[in-house]
């Protein structure tokens, strides 16, 4: 079954399949009256979201559209649909949220500019899932009555499997609202461009762009020189900068490159080889490590292990390096990359030129141990040259390429892969580039995850934390009080990231 499913998804991720699906959809739609009393509805025409519906109809008057999905035993799911004009006479959208295998009653509400509304109801049995994920996640901490967790959907990014891989959408009640198959490996985050496309990785080789209806408009293969890993970001031109591994290297160094993918042509260019930028440090490390983006790789040299990239408006970039527990600022990434400064424990880089580039810690707090998901936050209330930076601090001290380094130099760090007492942390820094300092402005303990994991500040001020190796994700208030938490069964070792998206302007 898995081999057949893998082959099916491989076919979905081809231009021929997507074009064929487009043609079939247009033929079927043309045979329908597609009025509000007889809407054209079909399941997942592009094979990219198992439980979704494609809906098309016209109305005599201009209306906005919203819908509510109801299935017995589950909380209702309500969304306003995106339309280019708020009120329109032609309506075409992807409807999310059906419960697989159950009778779903969908109330579609049409509202005109005067606020007058009318509702049409359709019934549809939800499609069977392709994966084995739970429809209702376990609530390890249920939100108090009246607690507002905000809108949007949790995107589960990387519950890696040896079988078929997916990205999942769950609502704030822990109910499955979308199953997006990918080729293999994982999607690391969602990027939205100015043309209404959502970009994500579908394998170590593929970046794809999906439109609002679920069609894969662009499917780019990175080619034979590089594979992607861990993260990517969109630059000011709409191109995508990716963390990458250079294939075919004599030294087998991995996860130490940044490349750029042109979203208009699919061409790939190298931006920086950190092995060249930090040649002395690389040479000082032991040839060791693994490459989880290439399970067949042998004798890898994972001396830096970048796991996050953040692009800044001035052309600089921030990188998180797990192997050195360092945050690295690089200037002019796309033209002439040079080191600006580093944040973290300086003694890791002792004896190298880079050791003098560390910002000064201001205050009494611990540095990070293998941080993930660093996020740059500009704030208009801050003077020029200052910004906030938050992250998931794994608080795990280890380095296969620095086996003799004593990580206990970092106060409170754990050196145990498995521990009943260790905690990871959410941390937020204020970085003052003018003074050359960083200080901690917020932190709290979260469930221990020595590897992977993510943190995300939400629009409502709450903080979403994924403790990946525990299979736990939840929302906290700014004081670190846990408001709600869910547990997802792990397919193998961890859930790489969980980010929340409201998908406004898309679905």
In which residue ranges do the predicted regions lie?
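Histidine-/acidic-rich catalytic cores in large beta-rich domains
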Residues: 3-69, 88-92, 96-103, 107-507
């Amino acid at each position: 079954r898995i081999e057949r499913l893998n082959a099916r998804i491989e076919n979905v991720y081809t231009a021929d399949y997507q074009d064929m699906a487009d043609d079939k959809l247009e033929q079927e739609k043309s045979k329908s009256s597609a009025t509000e009393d007889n809407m054209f509805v079909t399941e997942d025409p592009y094979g990219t979201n198992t439980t979704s519906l494609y809906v098309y109809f016209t109305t005599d008057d201009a209306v906005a559209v919203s819908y509510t999905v109801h299935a017995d035993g589950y909380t209702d799911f309500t969304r306003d649909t995106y339309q280019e004009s708020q009120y329109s006479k032609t309506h075409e959208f992807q409807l999310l949220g059906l419960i697989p295998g159950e009778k779903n009653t969908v109330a579609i509400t049409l509202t005109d500019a005067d606020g007058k509304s009318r509702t049409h109801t359709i019934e549809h049995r939800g499609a069977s899932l392709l994966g084995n994920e739970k429809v209702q996640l376990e609530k390890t901490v249920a939100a108090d009555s009246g607690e507002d967790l905000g809108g949007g959907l949790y995107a589960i990014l990387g519950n890696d499997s040896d079988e078929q891989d997916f990205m999942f959408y769950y609502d704030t009640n822990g109910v499955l609202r979308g199953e997006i198959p990918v080729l293999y490996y994982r999607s690391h985050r969602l990027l939205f461009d100015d043309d209404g496309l959502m970009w994500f990785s579908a394998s170590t080789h593929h970046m794809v762009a999906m439109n609002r209806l679920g069609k894969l408009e662009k499917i780019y293969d990175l080619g034979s020189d590089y594979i992607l890993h861990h993260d990517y970001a969109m630059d000011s031109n709409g191109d995508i900068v990716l963390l990458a591994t250079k294939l075919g290297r004599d030294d087998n160094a991995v996860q130490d490159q940044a490349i750029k993918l042109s979203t208009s042509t699919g061409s790939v260019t190298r931006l920086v080889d950190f092995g060249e930028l930090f040649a002395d440090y690389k040479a000082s490390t032991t040839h060791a490590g693994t490459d989880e983006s290439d399970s067949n790789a042998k004798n890898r040299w994972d001396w830096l292990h970048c796991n996050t990239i953040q692009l800044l408006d001035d052309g600089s970039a921030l990188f998180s390096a797990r192997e050195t527990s360092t945050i690295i600022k690089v200037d002019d990434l796309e033209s002439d990359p040079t080191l600006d400064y580093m944040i973290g424990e300086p003694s890791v880089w002792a004896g190298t030129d880079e050791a003098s580039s560390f910002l000064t810690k201001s205050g009494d707090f611990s540095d990070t141990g293998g941080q993930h998901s660093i996020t740059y936050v500009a704030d208009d209330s801050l003077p020029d040259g200052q910004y906030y930076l938050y992250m998931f601090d794994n608080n795990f001290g280890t380095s296969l390429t620095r086996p003799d380094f004593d990580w206990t130099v970092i106060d409170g760090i754990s050196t145990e892969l498995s521990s009943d007492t260790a905690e990871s942390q959410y941390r937020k820094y204020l970085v003052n580039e003018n003074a050359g300092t960083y200080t901690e402005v917020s932190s709290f303990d979260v469930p221990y995850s020595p590897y992977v994991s993510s943190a995300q500040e939400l629009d409502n001020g709450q903080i979403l934390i994924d403790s990946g190796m525990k299979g736990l994700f939840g929302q906290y208030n700014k004081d670190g009080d846990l408001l709600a938490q869910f547990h997802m069964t792990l397919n193998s070792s961890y859930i790489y990231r969980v980010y929340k998206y409201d998908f406004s302007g898309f679905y």
